Amino acid sequence: MKDIALKTCTLMLIVAMMISLGCKKDRNPVQPSASDSFLPMQVGNLWYTNNQNYTEIKDSLVISGKLYYKFYSLIGGDAVSTSYLRIDEQGKLIASDPKYPDLKVVRADFNGKVGDKFFTTGQGNDTDNEVTITEKTNTQMSFSFDAIYHPNLKGHAYVVSYVKGQGFPGNWTKLKINGVTLK
């Protein structure tokens, strides 16, 4: 009788351990490697030239049910820019703003190919840009922006590039991506 009780107790203990270990939620999910993204997004990422010129991801927030990252930039020591960005399920870089949650601006399409075109807002007004993918390699993507609906800016395109695993190109004195200091 003692043997049966001991075996039953041991079996119950093993089953309880299996259940508790099997139902454990992963509290540290694996983050995508920085090298997998043309714009790695994690709070604390830093692109730094000096104390008057840098961009840092300061926070994350939800806009219209979607997670965005708050990019804070100081330019020339006195100009400030704040952008709220996310990469959607189709690989598009989307900008929005908590003050204007219905605003969605497509800034890049990382799944596109050279020659593909898209519009930033699709509204066909003077703030809408036609974007053309001009370069795509294993390490870099470039996008040409042309304000084709603006009477004075049409035909004066500018290019924005992204480096895989780094995000913004540049000769950074400090570069921190996904918790790893690269420079």
Q: Where do the PLM segments sit?
A:
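C-terminal motif of bacterial Sec signal peptides marking the signal peptidase cleavage site
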Residues: 19-22
